[in-house]
Amino acid sequence: MEIFSYIIIAVVAYLLGNISTSYIVAKRIAGVDIRTQGSGNAGSTNVLRTLGKRAGAMTFLGDVLKGVMAVLISEFAARLVGIDTLLAGYLAVICVVAGHNWPAVLGFRGGKGVATSLGAMLAVNPVITLMCLAVFILVVAITKYVSLGSVVGIGCSPIFMIMVKNKAGLIVALFLTASVIYNHRANIKRLLNGTERKIGQKKE
């Protein structure tokens, strides 16, 4: 019964992740498929760069909310059936981010998972999430590179989990870090060769 409950929670969280805010916003505002615009990524940064601040903010907030809701729904369901709420929450984090990054409904072409990771982890472990967010803001403020801030910010999460001796959280943090690095591999290459765009920099 417990295993079945966790499977249901995982599936529901993954399906929530499949709700692509960027796709919906781009279709509503500009009538375009965001995957054919800019970098081709179905994420808030690409929406911001191609459709403007309003659309970018809507996408970012939608992705964050999606992560929060996945965890809250999972923890509520866990309480109802009497299973571990923390484990259910962490499982939801992994699955909602996986659903966002690799959505079945969009041919497994999704976003990079930063905003959804932020929302999901904020719901399950707010203190560490805010610490990672502070690192992100600091790195972006200094370098003007959103991609670098994303990688470094989430990359700090395993370190923070080790510091507080949170083994379950460490596993989730390692997954999030690996997925963000993987999805930012093109950005990392551009950072290394000096061609990555900074905030406000126009595409040449």
Curated annotation (Swiss-Prot):
Keywords: Cell membrane, Lipid biosynthesis, Lipid metabolism, Membrane, Phospholipid biosynthesis, Phospholipid metabolism, Transferase, Transmembrane, Transmembrane helix. Its main location: membrane. It is an enzyme of class 2 (transferase). The chain crosses the membrane at residues 6-26, 80-100, 122-142, 144-164, 168-188. Signal peptide: none annotated. GO terms for biological process: phospholipid biosynthetic process. Pfam families: G3P_acyltransf. It catalyses: an acyl phosphate + sn-glycerol 3-phosphate = a 1-acyl-sn-glycero-3-phosphate + phosphate. Pathway: Lipid metabolism; phospholipid metabolism. It is found in: Cell membrane. InterPro entries: G3P_acylTferase_PlsY. It comes from the Bacteria. GO terms for molecular function: acyl-phosphate glycerol-3-phosphate acyltransferase activity. The keyword Aminoacyl-tRNA synthetase does not apply. Its EC number is 2.3.1.275. Belongs to the PlsY family. This is Glycerol-3-phosphate acyltransferase. It comes from Clostridioides difficile (strain 630).
